[in-house]
Every structure is written in structure tokens, then in C-alpha cells.
Amino acid sequence: MDEAPLGQIKENKMKRLIILLAVFMMSCTQQKVTDAEVIELLDNYFTALDVDNLESNMIDKYITDDYFIYEAEKKMPTKDFKVFISEAFKSFNTASSEWAFSDIRISTDINSAHISYINDGKFLSHDSILTEMKWLETGYMVKTNDGLKMKFMFSDNIATKITPSSK
């Protein structure tokens, strides 16, 4: 019966150990946040801010407990931001709201993401007055046990156009 020399047995065991260790380490490697996850969160965040959804507290699913935004030259925690948006919709008598994003730039790692973009918002009032606003915005997102969430937003209004009703 042929027996492998002791050195070859040790070498084979070492190779198996290295292979097992490599497989284990690869399975433990965390994946970076993807651009698709970032865009999905941004879309969901603004869907939650839609005039039809704002009162539902849907936004809470997409933000961290310590979320805040810098908007209208003020730092606002979630509660204050909800009041700000609600009052803005009421003052404009908003019937519909929509946003379109352009010039999107995303940077990610395994635990977080940063996005900057131009946000073009259109708000139609019940009196058919169209308000178009353009913002330069940036957001910081973090991985949580519940998935990717918005932790911070910065929003700077760079243009506003109001088109009166043609009635």
C-alpha cells in the first residue's frame, strides 16, 4: 500500500486550511451600498414628501431617528421639517407635487452613501398656479438594521418661477 510521505500530508492539510480560510473570509466580506439602493431611497424619500403622502408619516420609514435637514436657512429635525413642508403646501394651496432629479453624483462605501443632485420640483395649486423650484441638494445615507436610511439632507433653493393661472 502506497502511503504519502508525512510532508505531503501536512502540505495538503495546509492547502485545505488556506482554501477554507479564503472561502470564509470572502463570505464575510460586506458589500458596498449600490447606486441603485441610493436612487431607490431618494425616490422613496420624495414619494413620502408628496402632498398626498405627507400626513401619513411615511417619511419615517426612510430616515434615521436622528435625521435632520438644513432647509430655508434653518437646521430642522424631523418634527420641524414635517411642519415646515406641511405649512408650505398649505400656503401654496398645493394640489400636486412632483420632483425630477438631474446631475446626480453618488459616492458609496460599505456603511454609507453620499448623493448630490439638482432637484426640479413642480407644485400645482388648486387655483392652477404652477410653482417651479430648483434646489441644489445633498444627502447622507447610512445602513441600518432596517436598510439604507437618510441621515442628513442639505437643500438650497437656487431658482423659483411662478406661473399664474391662465383663467
Predicted regions and their residues:
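A solvent-exposed, acidic/Ser-Thr-rich amphipathic alpha-helical stretch
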Residues: E55-S56, D60-T108
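Short, cysteine-centered beta-strand-loop-beta hairpins and adjacent loop/turn segments enriched
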Residues: S91-A95, K122-T131
